[in-house]
């Protein structure tokens, strides 16, 4: 939905014709007591929309590598000559990928991948990484922030014109909140979405 919303807002869908990479943990699943388990970022690999699958990198074999340094080196080899248009992942992982590309080619990422248009990230606060990424990329590109967690997919950035993310209300998630300034009291009052007020900071439970 985040990517479709971006296409709707900007009118830009050219990136779907290029190569895309989602830096993530191994997508291999294990079974324990009859339940399939795996890394959250790896599980998400099984739910990439069909219209993005055909141009997706890296290869399955590379994606399943456990050693992260070996994996990123292999990803660099698989992508350095490709027409990369979308790059996604946790900022610290993507930073490592970009730095290895830069070390290999001595090029800014925006010069190496001339059609690189969209950076998708989540998992951590991006602000500490922003200056480093701007330097590594060397030019402005659009970005989409996501709010994924093991408990559910909560929100995504729905505008290139404003900061912030829109909370997903139709994903089978029941939300509860506590006012941020009451979070550390012994019995804070929990409220549901209908009682949330604009302009007040909340902790999502």
Regions found by a protein language model. Give the residues of each.
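Active-site glycine/GP-rich loop and adjacent strand/helix microenvironment
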Residues: 19, 32-205
